[in-house]
């Protein structure tokens, strides 16, 4: 067997079906679009969600909630992630980005208390959960809100 002798498996590849090329092709005349009507025309068809004039579902259901324009989105870091740093390290948002502990910085960093911290660190962040603050201080570290 040589490279130029390779052939695709039988039936795995088929020719493109060209419509509107004569009656004997099986797809001549109306080209698989049926007779007349909106969907038979060029550019024809209804928009997504259109239900034939009936009040559509998205209008029957009530609106809910609102989008807060001043919402802040924090990058979340858990305590067990902070164990990768050496004792006495000053952990800042810049250091977290540099070490790829945080993927994308948004409006700041928030430290949450998932996991245990075993190192004595100085942690600087924009927000802390109460439990995270207590855990860092219990491990001998310090907490600083930026």
Curated annotation (Swiss-Prot):
NCBIfam families: rplO_bact (TIGR01071). Part of the 50S ribosomal subunit. GO terms for molecular function: rRNA binding; structural constituent of ribosome. Residues 42-52 have a biased composition (Gly residues). GO terms for cellular component: cytosolic large ribosomal subunit. Binds to the 23S rRNA. Keywords: Ribonucleoprotein, Ribosomal protein, RNA-binding, rRNA-binding. Residues 1-18 have a biased composition (Basic and acidic residues). PANTHER family: 50S RIBOSOMAL PROTEIN L15, LARGE RIBOSOMAL SUBUNIT PROTEIN UL15M. One of its GO terms (biological process) is translation. It comes from Exiguobacterium sibiricum (strain DSM 17290 / CCUG 55495 / CIP 109462 / JCM 13490 / 255-15). InterPro entries: Ribosomal_uL15, Ribosomal_uL15/eL18, Ribosomal_uL15/eL18_sf, Ribosomal_uL15_bac-type, Ribosomal_uL15_CS. Residues 1-67 are annotated as: Disordered. Belongs to the universal ribosomal protein uL15 family. This is Large ribosomal subunit protein uL15. SUPFAM superfamilies: Ribosomal proteins L15p and L18e. It comes from the Bacteria.
């Amino acid at each position: 067997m040589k490279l130029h002798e390779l052939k695709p498996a039988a039936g795995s590849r088929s020719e493109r079906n060209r419509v509107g090329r004569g009656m004997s092709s099986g797809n001549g005349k109306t080209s698989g679009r049926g007779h007349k009507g909106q969907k038979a025309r060029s550019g024809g068809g209804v928009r997504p969600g259109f239900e034939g004039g009936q009040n559509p579902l998205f209008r029957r259901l009530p609106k809910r909630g609102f989008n807060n324009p001043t919402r802040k989105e924090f990058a979340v870091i858990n305590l067990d992630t902070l164990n990768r740093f050496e004792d006495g390290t000053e952990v800042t948002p810049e250091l977290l980005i540099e070490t790829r502990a945080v993927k994308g910085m948004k409006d700041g960093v928030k430290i949450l208390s998932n996991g245990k911290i075993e190192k004595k660190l100085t942690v600087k962040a924009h927000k802390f959960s109460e439990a995270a603050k207590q855990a860092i201080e219990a491990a001998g570290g310090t907490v600083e809100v930026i």
